[in-house]
Amino acid sequence: MKKSNTRAKNKSKDLKDTVSNQFKDSLLKFIESSEGFVYPLIIPPVQSIDEDALFEVYSDLRKIGEQDNLNVLLYSYGGDAQTAFHIGRLLQAYSNKKLQIYPLREAKSAATLIASAADNIVMSELSELGPMDPQIKLPSIERRFSPLAIKHSLELLHGEISNGHDLIVKTLAERLPDPLSLGEALKSLETGKDYLRKLLVSRMFAGDSEKAAIVAERLVLGYPDHGYCIDFKEAQDIGLVVQEVPDNQRDALYDLMYGYKKMWDVFEFAMSRKDDNESSVSEAIRPLIDLKQVVHEVIDIQKSKKNVSEEK
C-alpha cells in the first residue's frame, strides 16, 4: 500500500513538473516573438488584487527596472480598486515609451483597471475584460458584493414604487444594506470612474480628458452584470485602444493561455484530493509556487540577455 501511494505521489509530481515546464516553454516562446520586456502579472483565482499583490508587483518591477517597451501578460479576476490603480501607476512608471497589456484569457473588474494603464491593449479571440465593478466588503454585510448590483436594485426599487407595487418595494427594501452602507457602495462606483479616468488620460488618451471620462463612464456604468464579457469588438466599441494579437504571437499566446489553464487544472485536482495534513496541503499548492518560480526565472533570463547585449 505504501509503495502504491509513493508511486501515485511520484506520478503526480511528474505531471506537475511537466505542466510547469510546458508553461515556462510557452512563456519563453512568447518572449522570443515580442519586442521589449515581457512581464507575466498572473494572479490566480484563489488570490486577488490586494496589498500582497502590490508588494509582489513592486518587487518584480524593481528587479526588471525601467524599460522602453514593457509587455504585461495580465491575468486576474479582480480585487481592490485602490491597489489596482496603484499597480497601474507603477506599470506606467516602469515603461518609458510603450506599455502594452495582454489580457491572458481574463482580466476582469479591477484587473481591467490595470489594463487601462496601457498605451494599448492587445487581445486575442479568447481575451476578456470586464466592467470596472470591484467587489467590496461593508461591515453590515457578511459577504463581498457588487456596488453595481446595489445600483440596479435601487433602480428596480424606484420602478416598482412608480408602479405602486408596495409589497415588492417592502421586500426589496428590507434586503438592501443600511443607508450609510448604500452611500459607501455608490461612492465606490464614482471612485472607480475617477481611477479609470486618471489612468486612461495618462497614456491611452494622453491629454484627452473628455475621451477618458466617456470610456470610464461606460466601463463602470455601461453594463448590467459584474461578469459581463468585454471581448475585442466590445472593447473597440466602447472606445478603448485595442489591437489584435499579431500573427507572429498568436500561437505563442494561445499556448501560454492553455498552459496556464493546465497548471490551474492540476492545482484544482490536487486541492480536491488533499487531506488536512501538512504534506498534502503543501503538495496541493505546489502549482502556485511553481507559477511564481517560473515568472521569476523568465524575468532573470530576460535580464541576463539584456545585460549581455548591452556589454556587446
Predicted regions and their residues:
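Terminal-region recognition feature
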Residues: M1-E106, T112-K312
